[in-house]
C-alpha cells in the first residue's frame, strides 16, 4: 500500500514517539505487524508534550526532529550537505536558484476573511482556497517518507500580542534560520506549548506545475488566513518565511487589534527614549539604528500598540555585502557559531568569507539571534517613541539632509516611501531611478497603505511624536556629479534631533516640498543643510527638484482615493 499527503497521523500514546503507518491507516507501536511496507514515523529531538501533529496533514513523513538547538542543526546541515562551516564558526549555505524573495509568486488565499479586506493587486495576488488545499496535499505527499524539522516559536515580544508559530521545514538550515529569526520559547514554555496559531510549511525541493497548481511558475509563497498556514515551495530563500509572518502580522495587528505594524528598526536611549528608523534597502536603516550609545530593540519589523513599541522578531537578517568590522562592528561580531551566512563566497583556499564578492548575488545575508548583538534590549520592548526618522537615499541630490515634517507631511511621505536606485544596484540600472514603496514596505502590506498611515497619524497625535525626513543619499548634485552624504554628518544630525538640539534653531520651508529645514546643526557645515546651496548651478537644482516633486505626485495618484484629505496637504507644490 502507498501513502498520500492526505494521510493524518494519530498521536502516539504517552511516552511513545513513533507510529506505524501505511496508507491512511495507523497502528500504535505496540501493534507490530510484520509488513514490509510499514514504516515508523518517529518524533525525535525535543517534542512538546502536546504535538497536535494530526492537524498538519503530514502523517506520512518518516522522521520529525523537534526543536533542535543550533549545534544539532548545524551538525545535521553539514552532514546533509546543506552548507559549510566558516572559519568564524558560522554556517555558510546557498539558497539555490533564488537569492531573494520572488514578489510575483506571492499569493493570498481569497476567502471570507480576505475578500473585502485585502488590498488586491500585483502585491497581494489572489489564490483560490480549493487550489491551496490541493497544493498543500501535494506538498505533504512530496514530504512522505522524508525527514522534516519542526520548531515551535513565536512572533511579537510584547506578550499581549504574542503569535505562536509552528515551522516545519524540509531542510535543517531553514530551521536554524527560524531559530535565529523568530522568538524562542523557554524550555518550560515548550513543555506546555499549546496548539500553534500559525504554521509555516517550507519545502524548497517541491516544484509546482503551474498548469496543475495554478501558480505562476514552480516556486510559490502563499498565505491562507482561514487555515492559518504559510505554504512555501520551490525556493530555498529563507527570507520568504520571515516575510510571510510579517505579512500575517501586517494584516492581523492593524485589522484586528488597531496596532500599527511597521517595517522599521528601533533603538532606545539611556533614558528609555525610543526612536524608529524607516527606510528601504540601502538607506542606512540598519547602520543608523546600530548606535553604541543606544540599545537595539530590533532591526526590521516592529509593532506600535497602546502600551509599547515591540519587536516582531528574535533575531536579525542583515545584508553583509562589503561588510567590514570598521563599518558594522556589531554585525561583524554577530557572525559566529550559530549564525548563518547566505550565498557568500570564500576567499580562495580558505573558509574565510569574502564579503566583497557579490558573484552569487549582491543580496548576501547573515542571520543571527538578537542576543548576539552586545547592546540588544531583551526583551525587545520599548516605550512610545518621541522621534521617527524616514530615511531616503535620494540619488538626485534634491532633498535636504534633514528636515522636520508636520503630521500631513509625515503621513504623505510614509505612504510614498521614497528612495532611489543607482547604477549597479540592479541589472539594467544605468542612471538614478525613483523608487516608491508604500509605508517603506509595500511588498508586505495586505491592507491599503492608507490604513497604516491613518494609524501613524493617530499615534503621532497621541504621543506628540516628531518625524524627520533624512536624506542619506547625494549632496552637491545628483549621482555621478555630487557625492554621498558623509555618514558622520548623518549621525550628527540624528543625534542632534534626538537630543533636542534642533528644536529651537532657525529653519525655512523648502520651496517645493514644504518641509522645515534647520539652518544649523552641531557637527555639520551649514552649507550642507541647504541642498540648493551645494549645487554649482542653482537653476539645475530647481529643475531637478521640480522633476522629483512631479514624480511624488504621479506616484501618489494610486492612493488618493483611499486616504484622508488631510494627507494631501503634505504633497509637494511644484
Q: Where would I find each of the regions flagged by the language model?
A:
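Conserved lysine of the Walker
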Residues: 285
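N-terminal accessory targeting/assembly segments
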Residues: 41-192
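Charged, amphipathic alpha-helical linker segments immediately N-terminal to NTP-binding catalytic cores
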Residues: 213-252
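A short glycine-rich, hydrophobically flanked beta-strand micro-motif that places a catalytic Asp/Glu
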Residues: 151, 259-266
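Generic C-terminus detector
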Residues: 528, 533-574
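Short, low-complexity intrinsically disordered segments enriched in small and basic residues
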Residues: 2-14, 18-30, 34
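Hydrophobic positions on the alpha1 helix immediately C-terminal to the Walker A/P-loop
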Residues: 288
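Glycine-rich, often acidic-flanked micro-motifs
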Residues: 42-87, 263-280, 291-292, 303-534, ...
Amino acid at each position: 500500500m502507498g501513502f498520500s499527503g492526505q494521510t493524518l497521523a494519530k498521536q502516539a500514546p504517552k511516552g511513545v514517539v513513533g507510529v506505524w503507518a501505511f496508507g491512511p491507516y495507523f497502528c500504535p507501536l505496540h501493534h507490530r505487524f510484520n509488513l514490509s511496507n510499514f514504516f515508523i514515523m518517529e518524533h525525535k529531538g525535543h517534542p512538546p508534550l502536546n504535538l497536535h501533529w494530526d492537524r498538519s496533514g503530514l502523517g506520512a513523513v518518516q522522521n520529525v526532529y523537534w526543536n533542535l538547538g543550533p549545534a544539532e542543526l548545524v551538525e545535521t546541515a553539514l552532514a546533509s550537505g546543506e552548507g559549510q562551516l566558516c572559519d568564524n564558526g558560522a554556517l555558510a549555505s546557498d539558497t539555490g536558484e533564488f537569492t531573494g524573495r520572488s514578489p510575483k509568486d506571492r499569493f493570498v488565499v481569497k476567502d471570507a476573511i480576505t475578500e473585502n479586506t485585502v488590498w488586491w493587486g500585483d502585491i497581494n495576488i489572489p489564490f483560490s482556497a480549493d487550489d491551496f488545499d490541493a497544493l498543500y496535499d501535494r506538498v505533504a505527499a512530496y514530504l512522505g517518507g522524508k525527514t522534516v524539522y519542526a520548531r515551535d516559536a513565536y512572533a511579537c515580544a510584547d506578550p499581549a500580542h504574542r503569535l505562536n508559530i509552528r515551522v516545519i521545514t524540509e531542510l535543517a538550515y531553514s530551521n536554524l534560520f527560524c531559530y535565529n529569526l523568530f522568538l524562542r520559547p523557554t524550555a518550560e514554555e515548550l513543555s506546555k506549548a499549546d496548539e500553534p496559531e500559525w504554521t509555516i510549511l517550507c519545502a524548497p525541493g517541491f516544484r509546482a506545475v503551474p498548469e496543475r497548481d495554478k501558480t505562476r511558475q514552480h516556486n510559490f509563497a502563499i498565505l491562507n488566513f482561514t487555515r492559518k498556514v504559510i505554504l512555501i515551495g520551490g525556493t530555498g530563500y529563507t527570507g520568504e518565511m520571515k516575510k510571510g509572518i510579517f505579512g500575517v502580522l501586517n494584516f492581523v495587528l492593524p485589522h484586528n487589534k488597531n496596532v500599527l505594524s511597521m517595517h522599521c528598526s528601533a533603538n532606545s536611549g539611556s533614558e528609555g527614549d525610543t526612536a524608529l528608523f524607516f527606510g528601504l534597502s540601502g538607506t542606512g536603516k540598519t547602520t543608523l539604528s546600530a548606535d553604541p550609545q543606544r540599545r537595539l530593540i530590533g532591526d526590521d519589523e516592529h509593532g506600535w500598540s497602546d502600551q509599547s513599541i515591540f519587536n516582531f522578531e528574535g533575531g536579525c537578517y542583515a545584508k553583509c555585502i562589503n561588510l567590514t568590522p570598521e563599518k558594522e562592528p556589531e554585525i561583524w561580531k554577530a557572525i559566529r557559531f550559530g549564525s548563518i551566512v547566505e550565498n557568500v563566497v570564500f576567499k580562495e583556499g580558505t573558509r574565510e568569507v569574502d564579503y566583497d564578492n557579490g558573484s552569487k548575488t549582491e543580496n548576501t545575508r547573515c542571520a543571527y539571534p538578537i542576543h548576539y548583538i552586545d547592546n540588544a534590549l531583551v526583551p525587545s520592548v520599548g516605550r512610545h517613541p518621541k522621534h521617527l526618522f524616514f530615511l531616503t537615499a535620494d540619488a538626485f541630490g534634491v532633498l535636504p539632509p534633514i528636515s522636520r515634517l508636520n503630521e500631513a507631511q509625515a503621513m504623505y511621505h510614509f505612504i510614498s516611501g521614497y528612495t532611489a536606485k543607482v547604477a549597479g544596484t540592479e541589472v539594467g540600472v544605468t542612471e538614478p531611478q525613483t523608487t516608491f514603496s508604500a509605508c517603506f514596505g509595500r511588498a508586505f502590506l495586505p491592507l491599503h497603505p492608507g490604513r497604516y498611515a491613518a494609524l501613524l497619524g493617530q499615534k503621532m497625535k497621541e504621543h506628540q511624536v516628531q518625524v524627520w525626513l533624512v536624506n542619506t543619499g547625494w549632496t552637491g548634485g545628483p549621482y555621478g556629479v555630487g557625492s554621498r552624504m558623509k555618514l558622520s554628518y548623518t549621525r550628527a544630525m540624528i543625534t542632534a534631533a534626538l537630543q533636542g538640539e534642533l528644536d529651537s534653531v532657525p529653519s525655512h520651508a523648502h520651496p517645493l516640498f514644504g518641509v522645515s529645514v534647520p539652518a544649523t546643526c552641531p557637527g555639520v557645515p551649514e552649507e550642507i543643510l541647504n541642498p540648493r546651496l551645494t549645487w554649482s548651478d542653482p537653476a539645475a537644482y530647481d529643475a531637478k527638484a521640480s522633476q522629483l516633486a512631479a514624480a511624488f505626485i504621479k506616484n501618489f495618484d494610486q492612493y488618493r482615493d483611499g486616504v484622508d484629505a488631510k494627507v494631501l496637504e503634505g504633497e509637494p507644490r511644484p
